[in-house]
Amino acid sequence: GVVAAKLLLKNFFDTDLLIQNREGQRLQQIIDEKGLDYFARAEEEAVLSLDIAGTVIATGGSVVYSPAAMEHLRRMGKVIYLHLEYETMCRRIQNLDSRGVVLQAGYTLQDMYKERLPLYRRYADAVIKCDNNTVEQTAQQIARCAR
């Protein structure tokens, strides 16, 4: 995200950081102490509070569960889905228990992946396959899509 913003000469904004700042807690603490429903509302409110067109915005993956948030993002600009195959996602996710991943009780990562995939595709204006990309390659593809 930040590398793409630099290529595009745009600002960069991370909604996870906004949520943490508003709540005064790390994402995982919010989920553990206040629950998934509370976190979902906080995430939706954070996204709906944004009025920053012309900015590269990185969201958490669970924002896709909020139609209102996704439509708001689409009104501000292009929604670009950075696609990873399931196996690649598993390799890249570190510290699952502490990184603030919204995972419903009883769900596996594969359940989450299968549930979110059609939602990501529904809201995406563009899809970039990132499995074999470096950060720089992905940023260049984001920049091409965003222009």
Residue ranges, per PLM feature:
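Short amphipathic alpha-helical segments
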Residues: 2, 68-71, 91-95, 140-141
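Short, well-ordered beta-strand core segments
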Residues: 55, 79-80, 126-128
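A conserved segment at the C-terminal end of the G1
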Residues: 1-10
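A glycine- and Lys/Arg-enriched "phosphate-lid" helix/loop adjacent to the NTP-binding pocket
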Residues: 76-118
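ATP-dependent small-molecule kinase phosphotransfer cores
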Residues: 15-63, 67-71
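Structured helix-beta-strand junction loops
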Residues: 33-34, 53-54, 75-76, 96, ...
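NTP-dependent small-molecule kinase module
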Residues: 7, 91, 117-147
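Short glycine-rich anion-binding loops that position phosphate/pyrophosphate groups of nucleotides
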Residues: 61-63, 85-87, 133
